[in-house]
A protein has these predicted regions:
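Boundary at the C-terminal end of the N-terminal hydrophobic targeting segment
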Residues: 20-24
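Residue-level recognition of tetratricopeptide repeat
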Residues: 69, 118, 159, 197-200, ...
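Short coil/linker segments at helix-helix boundaries
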Residues: 35-58, 79-111, 117, 124-155, ...
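Bacterial N-terminal signal peptides
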Residues: 8-17
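TPR alpha-solenoid repeat register
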Residues: 72, 121, 162, 203, ...
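The canonical Cys-X-X-Cys-His
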Residues: 262-272
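TPR/TPR-like (Sel1-like) alpha-helical repeat modules
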Residues: 143-147, 160, 181-191, 217-234, ...
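Canonical tetratricopeptide repeat
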Residues: 75, 124, 165, 206, ...
Length: 272
């Protein structure tokens, strides 16, 4: 898979993770707008990419009535990223998509001007910055993005969205920028949340892959066996991993393929 495709699928997963607004005091009108934004987000992640224009338009208008609300700015940033990711996933123009990403980043930055401890804005801004900078081979900027995601987890350690963002962003970064300990912590948290579901099964495989990358083959096998014994759609992939362990190891291409599929389809994040 091309680096640009990996970048866009990773961004898509960030967008498709449902936000947990609000983090600010809301008027009834603002609360209603945020509920509608969340509904648009669920439609978008279900593949209804054509909702993006009205999703963005609603949130561009909303701050006029409540200009100091960080949640609205954060929601607008997510909407811009959704529009960009939707365009690229349906064959749109890269230049138009990048314009949306820039607008999204500006919206997150405005949210952080209003509330410097807004965990979701920090996580998403940091995740996008880390991915883009890694793609552009700018390690210092990527490291700043990683630091923002780490700060977001410190602020909201029990936020599924924040954990998802850091986990999936980190797994998509260049090896020199990855933090295996943080990835393990996030995956373990997410496995507990999703235990017994299809997302949980795929997360177990990803956790096994991380163990394999670190040379902990017995622990990797344990994770694969949990899924391989189940009736889950993920069982076939887990069994293939178990066979691979007896034949020299899991192929890097298979590990990356699953991570890319997670970004494109969000099966780990949302499937049941």
């Amino acid at each position: 898979m091309k680096k640009s495709s990996i970048l866009w699928t990773a961004l898509a997963c960030l967008v498709m993770s449902p936000a947990a607004w609000p983090q600010s005091a809301e008027t009834s009108r603002t609360a209603d707008i945020l509920r509608r934004a969340r509904a648009y987000q669920f439609q978008f992640r279900a593949g209804q990419y054509d909702v993006a224009p009205q999703y963005v338009a609603m949130l561009e208008e909303a701050p006029k009535a409540d200009p100091e609300n960080a949640d609205l700015s954060n929601a607008l940033g997510v909407a811009y990223l959704a529009k960009s990711a939707g365009a690229m996933l349906t064959g749109g123009k890269p230049a138009d998509a990048w314009t949306g990403v820039r607008k999204g980043m500006q919206a997150f930055e405005h949210a952080l001007e209003l509330n410097s401890d807004h965990a979701e804005a920090l996580a998403t801004h940091g995740g996008v910055q880390a991915l883009m900078a890694s793609f552009q081979q700018a390690p210092q900027q990527a490291a700043k993005g990683v630091a923002e995601m780490n700060r977001a987890v410190e602020l909201a350690p029990n936020s599924v969205r924040v954990r998802l963002q850091r986990a999936f962003s980190s797994l998509s970064l260049a090896d020199a920028l990855r933090n295996n300990a943080a990835e393990a912590e996030d995956l373990d948290f997410l496995i507990k949340v999703a235990e017994g579901s299809r997302p949980g099964d795929y997360l177990h495989i990803m956790r096994g892959d991380l163990y394999f990358e670190r040379g902990k083959l017995d622990l990797a096998r344990n994770q694969y066996e949990v899924v391989g014994k189940s009736a889950s759609p993920a069982a076939a992939e887990a069994k293939a991993r178990l066979i691979a362990l007896t034949q020299g190891g899991v192929a890097v291409t298979d590990i990356k393929k699953l991570r890319s599929a997670a970004g494109a389809n969000c099966t780990m994040c949302h499937g049941r």
